[in-house]
Amino acid sequence: MPNIKSAIKRTKTNNERRAHNATIKSAMRTAIKQVEASVANNEADKAKTALSEAAKRIDKAVKTGLVHKNAAARYKSRLAKQVNGLSA
């Protein structure tokens, strides 16, 4: 437990940010799973709308620094490939 006032404040801030980051990452993962579930059920329309939502969540995670931009591009590319495979 920190004794210095600034260290106490930093600990509080870190805990708040950790909780906030966890919610953003969780929402991103949920959106990705929704796309994958739609693809597994061969629901092309649902998969396309879920893909746009997932891309939005992934981009927000990049903007806040939770996910590296290259990793985000990889996630979006793999999801898009799965969705495009349905219509082919």
Swiss-Prot record:
SUPFAM superfamilies: Ribosomal protein S20. Keywords: Ribonucleoprotein, Ribosomal protein, RNA-binding, rRNA-binding. Residues 1-20 are annotated as: Disordered. GO terms for cellular component: cytosol; small ribosomal subunit. GO terms for molecular function: small ribosomal subunit rRNA binding; structural constituent of ribosome. GO terms for biological process: translation. It comes from the Bacteria. The keyword Magnesium does not apply. The keyword rRNA-binding applies. Binds directly to 16S ribosomal RNA. HAMAP family: Ribosomal_bS20. Belongs to the bacterial ribosomal protein bS20 family. This is Small ribosomal subunit protein bS20. It comes from Bacillus velezensis (strain DSM 23117 / BGSC 10A6 / LMG 26770 / FZB42).
